[in-house]
Amino acid sequence: GWHIECSAMSLKHLGERFDIHGGGSDLIFPHHEAEIFQSECCLGHDPVVQYWIHNGMVNVDGEKMSKSLGNFWTISEALENVDPLVLRYTLINAPYRQPVDFNQVMIDDSETHHGRLVTCYGEGLAKFGRGASMNKECDWRMFPELVDAANRFEEGMDDDFNTRVALVEVQAVVKMLRGLLDDMVDYNEVTDDGVYIGPISDFIAGLIGWLSEFAGEVLGLLPEEADILEAIHSEESAKDEISQDVERLL
């Protein structure tokens, strides 16, 4: 009965042809094959569905997630222990068709890499963001390295939504930005309002813009800019208070 139910619901709500049908890889046979057979015989044409997207299974510590094994997590339960953006990073760190082994080591690794992304982006935004937003010439498309990274990112996403390839490019751009931020005091000047200027400031602004577009808008891995800047301001204020306490003790 459930095969014909899905064919009937699809026809009622999506029409005789629709673009994408999703589902787990365990449903390919017999469920989805039965849907195809029923729908095409009923309607007299094919294909009814243009693209079938089958996701891999989620395993927990090497075992299939199931209620019978007692290792079943709902999204709500996972979010009680894992930041939503870290969870997203964890799940897209592998092509969606492949199984994902959901374990604490994987979550910790994702938390480290995601934290590096947000921290690096936030530092760059705080020091170069205002200049970058005002200077339209800082567009990342000016820089061949970033155009190449964007092309590789898009090629990965065009290859059946290979988000793992896309994340590799994000990590590479973060590494570039991190290196420049660590060394920027050597070849940049600071204005009275705290904005860095100098020979590489445009490139750093381009890196920030690239991350905003691809890590933020496309992959959805960045918090709101206001939240990032507020967190950085709070951290800097806390550091200042500690420094003042130390000075008083001395």
What are the functions of these language-model segments?
Residues K67-L250:
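Conserved nucleotide- and phosphate/pyrophosphate-binding catalytic cores
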Residues G1-K127:
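Alpha-helical recognition segments enriched in aromatics with Gly/Pro capping
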